[in-house]
From Swiss-Prot:
Keywords: Developmental protein, Differentiation, DNA-binding, Metal-binding, Neurogenesis, Nucleus, Repeat, Repressor, Transcription, Transcription regulation, Zinc, Zinc-finger. Belongs to the krueppel C2H2-type zinc-finger protein family. This is Fez family zinc finger protein 1. GO terms for molecular function: DNA binding; zinc ion binding. It is found in: Nucleus. The gene is fezf1. It comes from Xenopus tropicalis.
Amino acid sequence: MDSSLQHKTTKIFPSQASRDSLSNRVTMISGAKPLAFSIERIMSRTPEPKCLPVPSLLQGSVPKGDQKQALHINSSSIPCMIPFVPVAYDHCPKIGISGAELRKSHLDSSPPFSCNDLLNCALTLKGDFPREALPLQQYKLVRPRVVNHSSFHAMGAAFCYFNRGDSQCHPPASINIHPVASYFLGSPLHQAPKSYLAERNKLVLPSVEKFSSGVTFKDLSQAQFQHYMKEGAHSLSDKITFKTSAKFSSASPSNKPKVFTCEVCGKVFNAHYNLTRHMPVHTGARPFVCKICGKGFRQASTLCRHKIIHTQEKPHKCNQCGKAFNRSSTLNTHTRIHAGYKPFVCEFCGKGFHQKGNYKNHKLTHSGEKQFKCNICNKAFHQIYNLTFHMHTHNDKKPFTCPTCGKGFCRNFDLKKHVRKLHDSNTAAPHAIGGTGQEELLLPNREPSPTIQSPQLQKSGY
């Protein structure tokens, strides 16, 4: 047990010789400039005491002996390990320290003030350092994190203030200091910092001056400390309105403003790419063409799904009728036929459909609009593919022929229906004259599945 523990410890903390060697290598690479985060300081840093929740602190559950120890601040000079980075956000004229001083304190080897000067180090900021110095009013609290080198976290306290003295709370007269409860700035509630940021928070919260100049936390009694913590929590609860700002709402993909509008139909899209994919619906362009059968598609994804039918692989079979399909989604739609499930119901006549496409085609029969007309006989159709198949009747082009009786059909759907009704199911696969290059395999000994005739087929006598 001891040997395994010693082995684990050796893994986590390297030997002194290896640390010295690594430190020398880093110093040689970096040149004369000392490192902000030295290897020795990181490896020898002791873990922070865990925070107790603030409600237990306010209820007085901390023993008296621990209270005095918790109120004690270690006044040793420990350089801050969290960088301050300026960002132009919200101007607060109460603070006047320059960004160059903050940068110098975190990059130089001998910072002018220690972590106790900026107690709690709960200021993690975003942005890039500008060449000129920025006032501290252009800093914002982005993600409060507790990296306190004192023992205040034993009581669950997290203070958000700017302190210029060693272990003393004597800010400039122009700055108002306010304590902040750790459950608003700490990690127990992850949503609280987001709500806090949504309201344009300032680096130092405005409030009535509570700490006089030269007062140390050692001089504060437990009652005063609890009073300040309660007041800080109430102040935040009054100021913070838990609603999402435009900054956070715009970051969600589902809440993006839809600004791309189709000039033809008025449909609105949230991205220009979606509008580009929509335009072939009006132009009729089908740039993605199948190299086997020559069929065109509006989108590349539809062409990829279409190519599966040329592989003649149908691994998905129906357990009831034995019909096979290329895709599992088609099989799931097919099972609705056996179950009698018709989720798409016409609101005009009450007729149900298994598939959404058939439902849309049926709704066009109620609209009375037949915008696709034949140039030869002026016959109109609801959809363009019906007009395409109708044109075969004028040029006597019937690419699909029955191998048994030799009858030709304009559509493969009509040929398969003819074979199921009139001929044996063991018949060989039908040919494609005129060459689509596509062959449909008929499964042997299969019960004829029910078919749904469209209104156009009923009128044409198929």
